[in-house]
Structure formats: C-alpha cells, structure tokens
Amino acid sequence: MSQPWRRGVRALSWTRVLPPRARQGLSASQTRCVQIRAAPAEQPASVNGDHLPVVATPNSAQSSDARFDVIGAPYSMLSVSLSASQNLYTRRGTLVGLSGKADNVSSASPVTALVSVRSPVTSFAVVHLNGSVDWMVAQRRALLAWTGRSLSIRPTINTSLSIAHWGSSEVTGRGLLALVGTGQLYSVELKAGEQYIVHPSNVVAYTMSSNPPRPYRFKSTTLKFQVPGLKSLPRFIQDSKFIQDMSDTDTWKGTMKLFHKIRTWSRMTIWGDRLFLQFDGPTTILLQTRGPRINEILTTHEVNEIADSPRGLTIGPRKPSEDKKTAEEALQPTPDAPSRSVDDLIQEVEGSAQRIATITKEGKVFFEKAGQKN
C-alpha cells in the first residue's frame, strides 16, 4: 500500500513541474489562470467633477543659505545644511547630530545637522517660503524646524474661527520650514472655485488666502442627549419653594455637572467625527494620514458649541465691509439733521455766551459781554 501511494504523490509532484502546454489536455478543464496585478496608484482623485491633484510632499527644499533634505524610509530624519551665517531653530529634544566645527552651538564654517522625533510613525515635509504666500500651521506639534532671517512665526488665535486656528502658528517671510505629521503627508492643491472638506485632525498646514477655512458639519443620524434642567419644568413647579431649595444644594449641582461631563464626552467620542473644515480654492493643504484625537484639537466648549449648531456651514461666508462714505457725502447734511449757519457753528465752538466778571472794592460783581465798552 505504501508503494502505490508514493507513486501517486510522485506523479502529482512531477505534474506540477510540467509546463502548461504539456498538461493542457489533462488539467485544462480543472484549472483556471488568475492574474493579479497592482492597481495603478497614479489616478488622480476628483473634486467638483474635476481632477484633484493629491501628490506626495517634496523631499527637499533649498534657499540661498540653507537646504532641507528628508532622508530615510519612511522619511524618518531631516538633514539640514547651513551656511556660516544662518540660524537654525528646532524643537527642543529633536537635534540628533551636528557635523562641522561647532563651538557653543555656533560655527564659522558650514555645518550639517540631523533632526528627528521620537515617534516611529511620523514623516516629514519641507516648505520653501519665498515671501509671496504665507502658511498657517494647524497642528500644535507639526512645527519641527525652520531657518531664515526674515522668517517670522507667530501664534494666532481667531475667536471667530477657533476650530481652524486652535493652536495654530502663522508663518510669514522668506525661508525654509520643516513640518512633521503622523503617518504619511500628502499635498492637496485646489484651484479657484473648487471646494474640499477635510477633518481638522488631518490638516497639518495650509496656505493663507482671502477665503479662510470654515467649520462644516455633515448630516448624520444623531441621538439628542439633553441635560434635565428646571427651565423644562412647568412654571408652577419652578416657583415652588422645594424646587428652589433643591437647586441650591450641592447634590443637585454635582449631578448637573456629571450630566454635562457625560454629554461632552459622548459628543467628543461618538459624534466628534462630524466636525469638518471646508476649504475654498485657490489654496494648498498638507494632510496627514493619521490624525490625533479630537480632544487634542478642540476644547470642551468648542465641541458643545459646534454640536448644538445645525448641519452645514457653522459660520457663513465673510460679508464685505460696508462702503465708507465719501467726503462729499459726509459734508452733505442728512434730511433728519438740523440745518445750522456759520454763526451757530462759531457760537458752538466759542461757547453759548461770553461774559467778563469785574469785582469792585465794595465787593460787588459786574458781568459784561466780551467787547462791550463801558
């Protein structure tokens, strides 16, 4: 029994080695060729019916005094080449090494520095600012290194659009900028008239334009979770002495505080993905594939404020400022304004009336008009 079994196994193994033409008559009816190919990754996405260029960020940027190169796979280190007269600013604890003759963190000759971060799932992107376009860094930990004498970085907080500018940094001037993101970084370029909606946790930086990003909420199935309050009760119950005394107790206040915390937590963990940003072109957006948690971007007050608003744009488009009146319109009197002569205006400037007080030796006081002769 063992020999026929070995022969069968040997015959099966030799059949697998034979070319397809030799065993076509034997296994053509039993097997089928399946071809597996990689899908093309160069197909552009589409936005508003047009092709949206989503490309990888550049690996190098160069100015007259410095050069940034992203090295490693997947982009785990930043190489900075500096001239003798250039300054380099990095985040604390990110400097890996420095080549060259450096004395007290300064050098009279060109040096090359290596900059990296501790997280193993980050990638770098470099941006060259030529002074014509300013950038807004949306993430608090995205700014890694920068160089440039005229480059200025200023923290900004916009009260009208705090969701987009929470923990943001405005970058202006000329120089090189190195950004770090979680996962991979990609660049999205929008033309004039195009719109793009993206989650705020995935936005690393974007170019500043006349159309700033606005908060946007998608429509989805929601469960209304309301905190019970005294205002929801009938009027005669609110005016009762028992209800008023109970609302002043520490037990009632602690219960209401607990309900508010549960509501805020549910909005941040369950319905937090409804908060998005809408960008209007022309602009360039740098996106990261792995976004942080929503509590690292929004405060509890902002989460509750956005969650209570209806779907769609939470802030309308910027209205044009009212036209200022011209000089001719300002000089023309309005119908409701009273007409005044030149004498009336002079009298208003000088006062309603002028009197000169004269005191005699007897202690009497005489009042005379200005310019009146005795």
From Swiss-Prot:
Keyword terms of this UniProt record: Mitochondrion, Transit peptide
Ranges that cross the membrane: none
Gene Ontology biological-process entries: inner mitochondrial membrane organization
UniProt organism field: Aspergillus terreus (strain NIH 2624 / FGSC A1156)
Family the UniProt entry places it in: Belongs to the AIM24 family.
Domain of life: Eukaryota
Subcellular location: Mitochondrion
Matches recorded under Gene3D superfamilies: Mitochondrial biogenesis AIM24 (3.60.160.10)
Stretch forming the transit peptide: 1-11
Any one of the GO CC terms: mitochondrial inner membrane
Presence of keyword Magnesium: no
Listed name of the protein: Altered inheritance of mitochondria protein 24, mitochondrial
Biased composition (Basic and acidic residues): 319-328
Primary site of residence: mitochondrion
UniProt-annotated stretches for the region Disordered: 308-342
